[in-house]
């Protein structure tokens, strides 16, 4: 809001700031009439609406381009006068300065383009440019680059522009020309209207060198030409340049096509692009050479610790993460710094110092340019000018000012060098390099390599050497690009040093090499390991204790990003906060509608994989009980299902109500809250809706839900699903009404289906439908049953399951064999079905362990045997879980067989004998067999 300033105070303010701007002094002296206008308007920012009002004033008549040039320059003069006065007087902050200058550029470019386009498209002249494919009138897309694109333009800046037209064709006027020629001519006229220096000055210098092929290319290019250029010739520095690109003229459809379908995929990779570090280092090295050549060390933009280095820091994180995190796909540098503060890839102190330095340097840049309205970022050399600059920045002397400036530049340089520090080679690099395939034939090379391994503590260096040589000689390695091979060569010395710290080293090495085979085809992830060597010990530690964890990383290498810092890995999930975060990622993004579903599918997958991985790391540290782990994995599945249901419903074209009267019911491990890392989801779909189209609509919804869960995208899948527990199994309807489901349970369901119902629960969806299911479930489980018949049915089902899962090995199958997990589950299911009519508390969804304890307390079986069995159940599940994670035997001294199978979790027959005996005893107590 403007602060009132009387005329005498305004005059005093203007007089006090005139020494800091020779341009203001000259302009006011040459055009005295502008002074009163400045004094009257000094309290008010110069908004774009006022700029447009000036250009469109009824008293103004534009007859030709000379009139246009004059009007634009008169506007610019007024804007600069007021803006400089407000800034130097402390009435305008940095944001106002940048916003006002950006508005001036946008407004003058659009106004000039409209005038020139109208003149050129007169029927008696060239006529309207028409697309040869669409037949529609074509408009010039002007892309603002650099600071104009970012909405942070300088007061005496040039403007970086690129001219693009949607499609080729011809104009329809008397002097017909090609669209290309039309837009080139239009572009030249526009440039002249902005940059030609007349008696009234200029508006903006125009720089067109950022267009494809630079100065040697046509002034205007078509959209297809730009797309082809990005695909075939686009360079890394151009990705950096196009981050700030912004379309300021043209049709909204063409703008969306350009920015979202052509520019965005070029700038922001779908994966985490850690190769951007090396590209930015190269770009910075070129900048350094130019600074040295031109002696620009006192240039606050290009010199050490200058504005450009801050921009490089923000942009490298945008290039690395923007394809995954749409929050970072923004233009203003300060805006990116704010987002980085929220996302914390850098310490808060670093962000604060970079922000303060950027604001100080930009404020200084403007004061350097106010002196003579020159595009300069060089510190003054003359003592008088040094004094003026120091005082305009609020310092009494140039020395104090320089001390403050140097502090900011030193901070920027320090942070820049920390982020872009050159990779250090291991002291063993040269020796390890000689083991390369083309150099590893001689005995001396192998011996030198083995000796290095021996010094690292490897007990069998010959075996390890042979395995590394085999890896280098593999088809996989030979098919890698040269750059990927070089990355692995560079990584190997450090990897071998790290692996030596995590025995058993032969197993750890094997798993690491398998991981490299998985991620080697993604250079960005090899770059991650190079740029962040602190991740290597974390990867090796995981690999040393868990085959499953190592394989999971290989399937989802993007999870390496989770290992960049140890903070957050061992913190248990805050589900309300994670729910909010997921909602933001899914819905609060600027993604084209045609790409939204793919984006949301990948967001869900990345989110689910990240949460699983964080739980996995905490689990492997021994900080998580198995029951708590299952609770968290179930909470995660519930959250994913809730979001998938909403997204699938939104995606339906035919809907008859705002919210679906639809429920997802969880069975098995999902229903019993005993999910493991690789569990599939047993689900059933129900609805309560008497609309005539309800069945077909909800069937389509269920199909969509299953598609969202099981589709393989570039990010993998969410969950495998099992839909066979619905009425009549695979031959039954995919969705059922609550009434039909209830009737089936009472009239047609088999005993095994009622067994399954003991572990079922409402997961997500319509709450009323969920309550109806839960009431039906309780009523069904509380039906009195003939215990003799029930035992017979359950024993028959147990025999069928044993036949369906034969164990041809001498090992004990923890899940399927007698005395294993399924025996405990069948015992619990019998107790619920047999006695819930007397003890309704048995219908609670409290898990097998709690139900066993409750059965003992109720006297349904021996309390001692129930306690022993629930303890055994815990041990069986823990061992099964450990085996599936480790993929190897437990340490020496345990009875686990080396033939153990991850898939079936089998152990030596004499292992877990106490647990099995406890299960046998309870089984005999219940079933008498």
From Swiss-Prot:
Listed transmembrane segments: none
Reactions the enzyme catalyzes: [glutamine synthetase]-O(4)-(5'-adenylyl)-L-tyrosine + phosphate = [glutamine synthetase]-L-tyrosine + ADP; [glutamine synthetase]-L-tyrosine + ATP = [glutamine synthetase]-O(4)-(5'-adenylyl)-L-tyrosine + diphosphate
EC number: 2.7.7.89, 2.7.7.42
Renumbered residue ranges of the record's region Adenylyl removase: 1-423
Pfam families xref list: GlnD_UR_UTase, GlnE
Cofactor(s) in the UniProt record: Mg(2+)
Region (Adenylyl transferase): 433-929
Matching SUPFAM superfamilies: Nucleotidyltransferase, Nucleotidyltransferase substrate binding subunit/domain
Keywords: ATP-binding, Magnesium, Multifunctional enzyme, Nucleotide-binding, Nucleotidyltransferase, Transferase
GO CC annotation terms, alphabetical: cytosol
Protein's GO biological process: regulation of glutamine family amino acid metabolic process
InterPro entries reported in the protein's UniProt record: GlnE, GlnE_rpt_dom, NT_sf, PII_UdlTrfase/GS_AdlTrfase
Biological function: Involved in the regulation of glutamine synthetase GlnA, a key enzyme in the process to assimilate ammonia. When cellular nitrogen levels are high, the C-terminal adenylyl transferase (AT) inactivates GlnA by covalent transfer of an adenylyl group from ATP to specific tyrosine residue of GlnA, thus reducing its activity. Conversely, when nitrogen levels are low, the N-terminal adenylyl removase (AR) activates GlnA by removing the adenylyl group by phosphorolysis, increasing its activity.
Protein family: Belongs to the GlnE family.
NCBIfam families: PRK11072.1
PANTHER family for this protein: BIFUNCTIONAL GLUTAMINE SYNTHETASE ADENYLYLTRANSFERASE_ADENYLYL-REMOVING ENZYME (PTHR30621:SF0), GLUTAMINE SYNTHETASE ADENYLYLTRANSFERASE (PTHR30621)
Name of the protein in its database record: Bifunctional glutamine synthetase adenylyltransferase/adenylyl-removing enzyme
Native organism: Nitrosomonas europaea (strain ATCC 19718 / CIP 103999 / KCTC 2705 / NBRC 14298)
Gene (UniProt): glnE
């Amino acid at each position: 809001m403007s602060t009132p300033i009387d005329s005498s105070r305004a005059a005093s303010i203007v007089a006090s700031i005139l020494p800091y701007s020779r341009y203001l002094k000259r302009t006011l002296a040459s055009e005295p009439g502008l002074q009163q206008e400045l004094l009257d308007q000094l309290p008010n920012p110069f908004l774009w609406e006022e700029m447009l009002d000036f250009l469109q004033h009824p008293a103004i008549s534009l007859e030709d381009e000379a009139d246009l040039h004059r009007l634009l320059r008169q506007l610019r003069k007024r804007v600069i006068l007021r803006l400089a006065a407000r800034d130097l007087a402390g009435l305008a902050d940095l944001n106002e300065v940048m916003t006002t200058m950006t508005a001036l550029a946008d407004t003058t470019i659009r106004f000039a383009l409209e005038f020139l386009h109208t003149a050129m498209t007169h029927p008696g002249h060239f006529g309207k440019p028409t697309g040869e494919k669409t037949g529609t009138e074509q408009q010039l897309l002007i892309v603002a680059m650099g600071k104009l694109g970012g909405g942070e333009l300088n007061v005496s800046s040039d403007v970086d522009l690129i001219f693009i037209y949607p499609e080729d064709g011809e104009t329809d006027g008397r002097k017909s020309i090609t669209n290309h020629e039309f837009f080139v001519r239009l572009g030249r006229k526009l440039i002249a209207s902005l940059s030609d220096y007349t008696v009234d000055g200029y508006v903006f210098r125009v720089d067109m060198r950022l267009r494809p092929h630079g100065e040697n290319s046509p002034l205007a290019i078509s959209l297809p030409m730009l797309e082809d250029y990005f695909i075939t010739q686009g360079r890394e520095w151009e990705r950096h340049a196009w981050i700030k690109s912004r379309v300021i003229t043209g049709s909204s459809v063409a703008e969306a096509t350009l920015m979202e379908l052509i520019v965005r995929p070029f700038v922001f990779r779908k994966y985490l692009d850690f190769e951007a570090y090396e590209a930015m280092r190269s770009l910075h090295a070129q900048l350094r050479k130019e600074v040295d050549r031109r002696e620009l060390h006192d240039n606050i933009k290009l010199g050490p610790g200058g504005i450009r280095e801050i921009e490089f820091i923000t942009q490298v994180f945008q290039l690395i993460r923007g394809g995954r995190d749409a929050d970072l796909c923004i233009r203003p540098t300060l805006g990116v710094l704010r987002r980085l503060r929220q996302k914390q890839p850098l310490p808060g102190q670093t962000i604060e110092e970079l922000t303060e330095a950027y604001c100080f340097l930009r404020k200084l840049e403007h004061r350097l340019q106010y002196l003579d309205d020159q595009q300069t970022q060089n510190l003054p050399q003359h003592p008088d000018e040094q004094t003026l600059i120091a005082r305009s920045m609020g310092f009494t002397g140039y020395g104090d000012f320089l001390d403050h400036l140097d502090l900011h530049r030193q901070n920027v340089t320090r942070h820049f060098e920390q982020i872009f520090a050159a990779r250090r080679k291991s002291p063993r690099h040269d020796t390890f390099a000689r083991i390369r395939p083309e150099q590893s034939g001689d005995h001396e090379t192998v011996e030198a390599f083995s000796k290095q391994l021996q010094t690292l503590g490897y007990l069998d260096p010959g075996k390890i050497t042979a395995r590394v040589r085999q890896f280098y000689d593999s088809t996989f390695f030979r098919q890698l690009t040269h750059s990927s091979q070089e990355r692995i060569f560079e990584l190997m010395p450090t990897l071998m040093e790290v692996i030596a710290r995590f025995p058993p080293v032969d197993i750890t090495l094997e798993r690491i090499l398998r991981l490299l085979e998985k991620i080697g085809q993604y250079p960005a992830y090899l770059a991650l390991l190079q740029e962040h060597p602190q991740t290597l010990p974390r990867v090796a530690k995981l690999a040393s204790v868990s085959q499953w964890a190592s394989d999971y990383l290989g399937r989802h290498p993007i999870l390496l990003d989770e290992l960049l810092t140890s903070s957050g890995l061992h913190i248990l999930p805050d589900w309300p906060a994670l729910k909010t975060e997921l909602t933001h990622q899914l819905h609060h993004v600027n993604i084209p509608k045609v790409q939204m579903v793919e984006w949301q599918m990948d967001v869900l997958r990345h989110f689910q994989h990240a949460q699983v991985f964080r739980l996995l790391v905490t689990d492997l540290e021994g900080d998580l009980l198995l029951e708590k782990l299952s609770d968290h994995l179930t909470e995660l599945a519930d959250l994913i299902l809730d979001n998938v249901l909403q997204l699938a419903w939104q995606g339906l074209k035919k809907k008859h109500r705002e919210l679906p009267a639809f429920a997802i019911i969880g069975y098995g491990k999902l229903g019993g809250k005993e999910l493991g890392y690789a569990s599939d989801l047993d689900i059933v779909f129900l609805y309560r809706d008497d609309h005539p189209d309800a069945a077909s609509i909800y069937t389509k919804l269920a199909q969509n839900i299953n598609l969202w869960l099981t589709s393989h995208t570039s990010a993998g899948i969410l969950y495998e699903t099992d839909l066979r527990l619905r009425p009549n199994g695979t031959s039954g309807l995919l969705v059922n009404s609550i009434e039909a489901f209830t009737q089936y349970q009472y009239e047609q369901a088999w005993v095994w289906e009622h067994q399954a119902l003991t572990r079922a629960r409402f997961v997500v969806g319509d709450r009323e439908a969920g309550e109806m299911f839960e009431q039906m479930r309780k009523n069904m489980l509380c039906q009195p049953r003939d215990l003799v018949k029930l035992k017979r049915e359950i024993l028959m089902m147990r025999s069928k399951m044993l036949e369906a899962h034969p164990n041809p090995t001498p090992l004990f199958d923890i899940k399927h064999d007698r005395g294993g997990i399924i025996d405990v589950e069948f015992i619990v299911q019998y107790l619920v079905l047999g006695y819930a009519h007397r003890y309704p508390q048995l219908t609670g969804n409290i898990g097998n362990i709690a139900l066993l304890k409750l059965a003992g307390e109720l006297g349904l079986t021996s309390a001692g045997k129930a306690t022993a069995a629930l303890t055994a159940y815990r041990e069986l599940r823990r061992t099964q879980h450990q085996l599936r994670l480790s993929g190897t035997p437990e340490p020496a001294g345990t009875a686990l067989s080396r033939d153990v199978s991850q898939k079936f979790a089998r152990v030596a027959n004499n292992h877990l004998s106490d647990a099995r005996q406890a299960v046998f005893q309870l089984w005999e107590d219940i079933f008498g067999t």
